[in-house]
Amino acid sequence: MKPGPRNLITDVEGLHVGNADDGSVKSGVTVLAADRPITASVHVMGGAPGTRETDLLAPDKLVPAVDALVLSGGSALGLDAASGVANALRAAGIGFDVAGQKVPIVPAAILFDLLNGGDKGWDENPYAALGAAAWRARSETFALGTAGAGTGATAGALKGGLGSASA
């Protein structure tokens, strides 16, 4: 198989990715969204997974599609990034219709980046604002590596980051 023209997930027509990060916190958020709600699925694994709304992705659930997917640093605190994205979606009139109200469906997963040397002594959780900023930044082209959710990612003592590919 040959990769798409950008070799990014956004080679799939209608997909967009946005990143936002905070260099002092050494953490960030990545949002995957589409021009219309998308079908999604998940396999949760690991010793201490952190997720939000992933149970909705089971085929026997009421919600048939999602409005965006969020990946965030910040461990459990990073789950608040999905609230920032959901607020931005709702303001744009996007979401699952419930009696005339829009309820954005935004599953999220986090990674543990609390021990990477960034300033985690903040008083107000920065992740909702980072989520909203990542939503506003969505595009067909986006940074890889130390960007978005990959900003503070590590694998043991090795630097991690955000990756993407297409086929």
State where each predicted segment sits.
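Alpha/propeptide regions of enzymes that mature by internal proteolysis
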Residues: M1-A167
